[in-house]
């Protein structure tokens, strides 16, 4: 039949299949920023296209060409990619300047800060449900400094649906 789709029975897919979650991690990214001192309270940052040397622009959907000052709360409300990227840049020990190059000096520390915070919410670790074939997600050991930026808005590591459900239930 035209337009028909084949479906596969996958009763355990919520614990075995992983995907890159995207914006859902932004609450945990804010937590990592607060705990590390990279940001404080409802700090205002400028949501603007992020221009890193020799890289494509990173934008937020609502300000893909312009800029706008937003608080941490608004960054969640508007799902700001660039607010999260600025947190990652601060975790790298740098301040955002258009056209900047990223230093790799604090790359491991920054990624560890993000991943450890995410793990506290259940992402990238076993849920303890004791079900067969549970995946802990896909957490690459090798990464570069650009991956730290994309990790901050959920476009690098991959998690299971049950991990994300646990995360959402904990917040």
Question: PLM features: residue spans?
Answer:
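Beta-lactam-recognizing serine transpeptidase/beta-lactamase-like catalytic domain environment
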Residues: 1-22, 28-171
